[in-house]
Amino acid sequence: MKFLQSLNGRPLRVWGLAALVAWLIFQVTRLALLGHSVMLSEQAPAGLLGGVAMGMLRDLPVVLMLAWPWAMFELIFKRKWADRLRWPLWTIYVFTLIFVGVSEGVFWDEFSVRFNFIAVDYLVFTTEVIGNIRESYPVGKIVAALAAFTLLIVWALRRPLRNAVAAESGRASQLVWALSLMLAVCFIGYKLPLPEFFTNSFANELADNGWRSFIAAARQNKLDYRQFYATRPDAEVMADLQRFSGHGQVSASNTGLLKASHAPSKQPNVVVIMMESMSAEYMETFGNKQGITPNLDRLAKEGLLFTRLYATGTRTVRGLEALSAALPPQPGAAVVRWPNITNLNTLGSTLAARGWEPNFIYGGYGMFDNMNSYFESQAYKVTDRKLFQEGLVQFENVWGVADEHLFDQVLINMDKDVAAGKHVFAHIMTTSNHRPFTYPDGRIDIPSPAKREGGVKYADYAIGRFFEMAKQKPWFDNTIFLIVADHCASSSGKTKIPVFRYHIPAIIYAPKLVVPKQVDTLASQIDLVPTLLAMLGLEGDDHFVGRDILKMPPEEGRALLSTYQNVGYLKGDLMTVLQPKRKIETFRISADGKEAQLVPNEQKMTDEAIAYFQGAALLMEKHGESGRGSGR
């Protein structure tokens, strides 16, 4: 421990020791994440070492930020109180550093990134998150082990800390150090940019620091498109957006007058089943050999299958946004998370104007991610786990009830509404294919709790069971079902927007109404809303940005993808990525979507990309200006 006691032969001060300990723990954390990337994400070590080296420098402002309170501690407290408080606070400090490092490992295992806006959200929705952690990991044993390890580290550091205390000088000198640290943090941490130096996203994440990324995400949970991204004249953007949508008007507000189409007695029910984290790669239809989705594969053969459909994002709220408002993804938080958004142009409002009864049915607590508030504000009738029929739920975990119980509630709701003469539109959100992957025993041949394969197979079992029961209902033959994922199970990849991590299944199933077919046109999640409306005979009644996939020329197919800060426009094998600071890059995407080669920007692609994403921002601005975005 001698190297912890002095630097260049001079004894460390307390803040210096605190800084050095933090820096060392950051390096251990980074090496652990490097090992995870190499062994589990199959990344080449040589491509990541630059990120590791860069990260050692990027840690400095965070290290100084963590050291500054120790300089203030020694300055403010008199020796008597400082001696009493120093060891307990030092123990808490070391434990916090270790705990955050382990937490970063858990988060990386799930998302392959440093802390981001998802981690910020997790601190808001503590019930689900803490419950999920408790059900997924032996928390008590982990915390006990971390506490024991902390005590061991503190004991090992007892002499360096004593020497550091002895090295403290007069208050004038301590004040100079405290002010110097504060200025250094402000200058290095806020004035100097932190660009992405590497084309490999894993390397960029390794070069970052979890403390820094968390603070940045907390400060930037909503991004103003005009301020940060490339723009074009508004009039040109809106003209292009109307042309791309295939009709004369697009809108964020529900202001359109719907034409008469179906007679009320012939209106089919519409059921959208959004499956949690159901990546296309899990289905045999798309090449999987594990046999974990037999029911989905059967439905894909018997229904209308979209083989090249891509999610707009990597979170449930993005999927909900796409399948309700059909808006291109915007940087920052999804519209579902925005407060006080009312009377938005949604699939539910469009159908409600023609006599359907909109419902949102969720297996979890709808307060999570603002789901209940969002859908209630759009005039959906909301049913979450709190409102399920008493005695119905026999199995649940922190994220939600078992999918089979969710579907049982759906059947109850639909029976009741149909019996009352209503035409039902139900948007259903499942939860079982989510960590901790627990489900009722005896349903599938993978025991619970399980890994992802178990969650996928149980979710497939539940949907198969649902359709077997639904087929016995008198309303089944007059119901159109859309089965689609909210997003993929993983968002990790080597590129800024790893295309293969956005490929999701989408199946329209209605044996008496829809002819089985395979559609290979490249399409976006937002296109499913106009496609459904066109199938219902309501083509032209909507004002959405998406297009009817069935009438879209294959050469005009495109997908809209997003991370938190980057938005991508995929057309053919090219993807244009719009980034903060008005940066634009274009990549040639490999056939499997896993590789991306940087190529020169193409003006036509750039203009189209800006039209979609700037256009979405303009629609929401106009929505707010109309007064329809004000409080309920």
Locations of regions flagged by a protein language model:
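Short coil/turn segments at secondary-structure boundaries
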Residues: 145, 197, 226-232, 427-429
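Long, well-ordered, tryptophan-enriched scaffold segments
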Residues: 138-140, 144, 236-240, 375
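Transmembrane and membrane-interface helices of multi-pass
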Residues: 2-224
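Short alpha-helical "patches" and their helix-cap loops
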Residues: 84, 225-236, 336-340, 546-547
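Alpha-helix initiation and N-capping motif
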Residues: 25, 126-127, 208-211, 222, ...
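Short coil-to-helix leader/linker segments, especially the first N-terminal amphipathic alpha-helix
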Residues: 221-223, 227-259
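Solvent-exposed soluble domains appended to multi-pass membrane proteins
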Residues: 245-632
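Short coil/turn linker and secondary-structure boundary residues
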Residues: 7, 43, 120, 124-125, ...
